[in-house]
Amino acid sequence: MPRSLKKGPFIDIHLLKKIQKSLKLTNKKSIRTWSRRSTIFPNMVGLTISIHNGRQHVPVFITEEMVGHKLGEFSITRTYRGHTADKKIKKPIK
């Protein structure tokens, strides 16, 4: 369900401070964050943000198409390992 328009987009304060600090510096180092709930703003375009997926930080390069989406949408938390194979041993028919 989308957020109400009268509330506006959400971003964690600590993440916003990290982004502003990174934009002032010349080196474009990756920003580590655990805030998957934060919305991507236009001033984040061009930055690499490492988003925590519960186990590790996944680096994501922010593009213009990502603006308005949440950071958590680009860091998958679940791994699908496929269905297990049938372990019944087939006996040869005599």
Curated annotation (Swiss-Prot):
Keywords in alphabetical order: Ribonucleoprotein, Ribosomal protein, RNA-binding, rRNA-binding
Gene Ontology CC terms, in alphabetical order: cytoplasm; small ribosomal subunit
GO biological process: ribosomal small subunit assembly; translation
Matching InterPro entries: Ribosomal_uS19, Ribosomal_uS19_bac-type, Ribosomal_uS19_CS, Ribosomal_uS19_SF
Family annotation (Gene3D superfamilies): 30s Ribosomal Protein S19, Chain A
Residue ranges the record marks as coiled coil: none
Entry annotated with the keyword tRNA-binding: no
Keyword Phosphoprotein assigned: no
Highest taxon listed in the record's lineage: Bacteria
HAMAP family xrefs: Ribosomal_uS19
Xref: NCBIfam families: rpsS_bact
Family the entry assigns: Belongs to the universal ribosomal protein uS19 family.
UniProt cross-references to PANTHER family, sorted A to Z: RIBOSOMAL PROTEIN S19P FAMILY MEMBER, SMALL RIBOSOMAL SUBUNIT PROTEIN US19M
Role of this protein: Protein S19 forms a complex with S13 that binds strongly to the 16S ribosomal RNA.
Protein name: Small ribosomal subunit protein uS19
Biological source species: Buchnera aphidicola subsp. Cinara cedri (strain Cc)
